[in-house]
């Protein structure tokens, strides 16, 4: 389907030559894409690669609980959707967990799922792991018969022991690693006074990757000023999922102290495609000149059998810097189109970059000559720096902002609340 679509843009001969060169295959192979019988066979093949709602309607699903981790499976606002095909069915499915629109990539959707073995209700699992666009569709009171003894009723504990520091400290010694991870979460929720040392100790001494990931996550979410060292070590964790989260967190934290570990991770683990994707997603997080200097410093003492990935990053840095400078120029230039200013400011929500971009946003919010709607968008973008290592400076700057407009004043208050609030 891609080749015929390309033909419409550049012509048949050019498209065939382009694809043959790209995939290093004979042009005759590409010409087969226009064979009607092959197109029909391909269409049928691809159809059978997916699960379709009409197929579920013909079945009686036996799974009591189904967890979906793909986009649109929980689109309950539509007449028909996959999770609904399981629930509204003569089968035995009692509950589903699915996303209405997108499946967000930087979340941990099966966090604490192991506690279902202790008889934890599906609704409690959803409370612990829910995030935007994720929906529990079905009976939240459903639970499986326990096949692991937690030593207490977990559903009662999650309600009646909320904020009970002594109880949850005791669960740190539970033989169940998921319970140990839950204990960290509950102690964090209870504002346990020694939570930072506990999280560091848990990361460095826990045998279970579940506990290490929970400790890392809670540190990054709620103590960004103290989490750079943990992120640095997590980039080289033995568990690949932790390394990937560390790559994500390195960008959001943005501490210059992470540059050596960030560069080392790229150089030493570039064969790990999923980690490399996360690392490259944070290419704007640090000053480009500092990253370039660190690359040259580390590669000077390395024996490189292939420099392609090194040269690729070195070539990418000036392009990224030029693009960032262009965005800053668009935002700061009063003559720029308003729609372009709004567009470029919003990019810092998903990629909260420190340094010059952050300084620019802070100054922009205080510039009374800017249109109020643009100042509101810039203020809202600052609220997305909630994992930034120096978010205290942002909070201070926002508190010093003198907003006369009521809408802007409310947005300043909301962003301060986001930055000061607890993350779960």
Q: Each PLM stretch: what is its role?
A:
Residues 2-108:
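Catalytic cores of nucleophile-dependent amide-cleaving enzymes
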Residues 161-171, 192-203, 224-235, 255-267, ...:
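Amphipathic alpha-helical scaffolding segments comprising HEAT/armadillo-like alpha-solenoid repeats
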Residues 109-193, 210-214:
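Caspase-like cysteine protease fold
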Residues 175-176, 207-208, 238-239, 270-272, ...:
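Short inter-helical turns and helix N-cap capping residues of alpha-solenoid HEAT/ARM repeat scaffolds
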Residues 69-72, 98-101, 129, 140, ...:
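Active-site proximal loops enriched in glycine and acidic residues that flank catalytic Cys/His/Asp
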Residues 169-173, 181-185, 200-201, 213-217, ...:
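Amphipathic alpha-helical repeat scaffolds
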Residues 84-93, 110-135, 146, 226, ...:
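C-terminal, active-site-flanking charged/polar segments
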Residues 155-158, 178-190, 210-222, 243-255, ...:
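Structural detector for internal amphipathic alpha-helices that build alpha-solenoid repeat scaffolds
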